[in-house]
Amino acid sequence: MKSAEIREAFLQYFESKGHSRVASSSLVPGNDPTLLFTNAGMVQFKDVFLGQDNRSYSRATSSQRCVRAGGKHNDLENVGYTARHHTFFEMLGNFSFGDYFKKDAINYAWEFLTSKEWLAIPTEKLCVTVYADDDEAYGIWANDVGVPEDRIIRIGDNKGGRYNSDNFWAMGDTGPCGPCTEIFYDHGEHIWGGRPGTPEEDGDRFIEIWNVVFMQFNRSVDGEMAPLPKPSVDTGMGLERIAAVMQHVHSNYEIDLFQALLEAAAQATQAEDKDAKSLRVIADHIRSCAFLVSDGVLPSNEGRGYVLRRIIRRAVRHGNKLGQTKPFFHTLVAALVEQMGEAYPELVRDQASIEKVLAAEEDQFAKTLEKGMVVLESALSELKGTIIPGEVIFTLYDTYGFPVDLTNDIARERELTLDMDGYDALMEQQKKRARESGSFKVDYSATATIEGHTNFVGYSELTGDASVTAILVDGENVDTLTEGQSGVIVLDTTPFYGESGGQAGDTGYIVFDGAKFEVQDCQKSGANHLHVGQLLAGAVKVGDKAQPVVDSAVRQATALNHSATHLLHAALRKVLGEHVTQKGSLVDSERLRFDFSHFEAVKPEELKQIESMVNEQIRLNSPVETELCDMEAAQQKGAMALFGEKYGDEVRVLSMGGAFSVELCGGTHVSRTGDIGLIRITSESGIASGVRRIEAVTGEKALSVIDASADTLNAAAKLLKASPENLLDKVEQLIAQNRQLEKSLAAAKSKLASSSADEWLSEATDIAGVKVLAKAVEGVDAKSLRDMMDKLKNKLGTSAVILASVNDDKISLVAGVSQDATSKIKAGDMVKHVAGLIGGKGGGRPDMAQGGGTDVEALPAAIGSVLDWAKGVIG
């Protein structure tokens, strides 16, 4: 049974049991900033389990793509060396949100695994574990399912504390938690290992294939376990593991999904040993890298981007170990698309952009490896002992982008170890500096409890009647807010838009009987809108009647920019290509900022075409239409989703100019495109590998930018005594004149320097047969300084010459030593000596070197010290 068939069978089975099939969410969690990557099927349902999100269904099933590399769940180091560790895997899951519980969950799992209609795994090949205190689950397995008691294993608190067990799951130190039951497959006596709970449980004979979690309790801060009013179920089964069972192989790398990738990796690396562990690493890593790039992650030196960079570079290094020194990793994307493109069409859509990102990173890594190895080899040559200092490790990472695990690989090959304590200390210092210089946004709902949900009416209203449902101060629930206090007010109904989809939250006021609250920002927390601000007068209590009033001018200006962003996105795709996808945005009342995927700077003529296309749509004054529908219908309309945004069952489709722009969006917009008035692109830049950024303004601000440009043009024309129409000709004429003057000045300086150099010949001091000369000259450029040095050196014969010149408070140094004197004194050493005394640095070859410095006052003494220094060197 092929992996794709198992995936589809699982989803069909649970659909037959009343579950809604839910598509895999992005690998970048949209609802949990504490997670680097989606690492389990339940992540996209976390808010549902917490009661902060409502769905139209109470049962769900999914095949969720997951990554475990970096953070708490990190399998990277084990990948390729074990049969079952992966950076990327698919998690098959079924979920109950206060619907069915233990009995149905256990019976569903057993039926799917063992019934002839589905997987038909022999029951004698399976055993199960339950939490030691979970008599209910034990009884269901023994009495309802009929599993022999000798194959039901109770697992207690085996991790050092109460409820710390392989069979007890918790979302965190507090919150939803409960026992779990796990199903294990016996690969047979020929494989070493024992049953769960035995000393040999870490062997590979008994492998967990399905974990069924019962969210039964809510753990409080003091450790009290209170039963949840609506117990839920969260299950997970690794597709790769169950595929190994169904395909009668022991290692996940032997299943159909991996065999094609291993063959492609062997061809790309020209590896002769088809069983090499490095091929496993490469085959695994192409999956995680391709899906991460498809989900908007790009290589960088921090966060998710750095984890991606580590995975790419680890794969490339394993290719190098197999003898492949040319870029190869990006060529494997085609094989992956062939294997998984049908299940994940986004791979097909993004194939070209994924290949370009990986190829660019391979090229960058080749340069990094070359530079980093020079630094590392230099450090190793001076190493005393077997421990590479933390400072070296940190410099390699921080300055050269050299991953620590790569340094560790090289160290291991040379039987060396790393000073990780020293590295960690330096890294913590850097993080501290970043924290001190950075800014952050307060999580106002971190510890608060907010009941109910806010009804948003802001699409059609800017004011209305409401009641206060909660008040928060410093993240804690309070009953009253007094004059002058800052805090958060939650209403049952609001016209205030909460920040999401790149659009800033609304501002304005909330008016009460005898009180007024200034809304400085509006954020979303689950199903509630948090009005953040300060009480200007009076006092407010929970339950008070309120009249929220949105600042209409700010809302309208924001709407102009948001609608313009949609038109800009569409124009970018039409001009640059379909590979362009949104990578982020910021829309407020002042401007719009749009980040998108593209692999080179946008050419000026392309920017002009894009801007013109958007303005054409604005002039057409097309209606802006919204429609509510399900996700499937939206996708059929060709609607594009926003990066990093999560969507419910019902989505809002926004169309402009007919089919010109169709996107999913919950933001506020204009009624017709003509309301935007005008767009003006103010900048285009690169912010990361493969990501560009456009900033623009609309409406009156666009007119202001155009007026300012015209004012600057007129002022420049007046200054240069030309008309605006003839300004370019005038500037070109002045540039030509300036070039001619510079040539004349350079010739005069060279002539002056030449005559001065002749006068200095007599000032050279003979030291053991070497004529040494050190001089400082005024206002000579670097080229003239080199010419002077060459002339002096040639006329002096066996000599060592160093010259210095000051220009714009910066000192230039140049030194030359005749070939017959380099065994006694070196130009690089001369420059280093003087540069060290003037707050600079320098170096070069034995016969020629350059440098510089900034301490102009110290220069005379530094030049004066050269003779004594040279005597000490030459002897």
UniProtKB/Swiss-Prot annotation:
GO cellular component terms listed in the entry, alphabetical order: cytosol
Keyword tags: Aminoacyl-tRNA synthetase, ATP-binding, Cytoplasm, Ligase, Metal-binding, Nucleotide-binding, Protein biosynthesis, RNA-binding, tRNA-binding, Zinc
Disulfide bonds: none
Location in or out of the cell: Cytoplasm
InterPro entries attached to this UniProt entry: aa-tRNA-synth_II/BPL/LPL, Ala-tRNA-lgiase_IIc, Ala-tRNA-ligase_IIc_anticod-bd, Ala-tRNA-synth_IIc_core, Ala-tRNA-synth_IIc_N, Ala-tRNA_ligase, Ala_tRNA_ligase_euk/bac, DHHA1_dom
Enzyme Commission identifier(s): 6.1.1.7
Function of the protein: Catalyzes the attachment of alanine to tRNA(Ala) in a two-step reaction: alanine is first activated by ATP to form Ala-AMP and then transferred to the acceptor end of tRNA(Ala). Also edits incorrectly charged Ser-tRNA(Ala) and Gly-tRNA(Ala) via its editing domain.
Similarity comment text for this entry: Belongs to the class-II aminoacyl-tRNA synthetase family.
HAMAP family xrefs: Ala_tRNA_synth_B (MF_00036_B)
Record protein name field: Alanine--tRNA ligase
Gene that produces this protein: alaS
